[in-house]
Amino acid sequence: DHGRNYIEKKYKRPFSERIFRDFLSKTLPKPNIFKFLVLLSKFGKIFKFLMPKSLRSMMDLSPQKIYGKTLRFQNVYKAERKRPTARVALLIGCVQRVVSPQINESTIRILTRHGVEVITMPEVECCGSLNHHLGKEDLAKESFKKNIDLWYDEYLKNGLDAIISNTSGCGTTLKDYGFMFIEDKEFKKKAKKISELSKDISE
């Protein structure tokens, strides 16, 4: 990741590559925009032969189907027990929210069935890893700080036993928040706590 950031700053990529990477940076972390583009890509495949090679490859990777929701979206999912055993925040993500919403829904069902109250925070769109991996560190840090503030405020006001991720890349990034802000006086304490609370669903 340090290497990507260095390359992004020091190496001038070809114009077409810069445009493509900016496009990814501005669309993938935004679920509504990404969903619209996935739907649009179904029609765009008709004209795929007219597109640049990089765009054709991306069209081939676009999901063939967008799964419908089977669980009504809400901010709080109550535990299926009188006394909840824990209260957690679920990172519903950006790309996964569109491509595989059933993973989040299954996670919620399993947790609530076992007595865990689950909250979702729509304001947390992306963990920041997409821009982080693209070497766009300024945009990534905007997401990191926004998420840290939102979760930390919730932790202080209502309590959180964990922040759950069911996407390995996102989970790794959340656990790195503490390290990323270790020299930031304002965010050091908050980032460390968020990393400590972060758990993969398998944990």
Descriptions of predicted regions:
Residues H2-E203:
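Iron-sulfur cluster-binding electron-transfer modules in prokaryotic oxidoreductases
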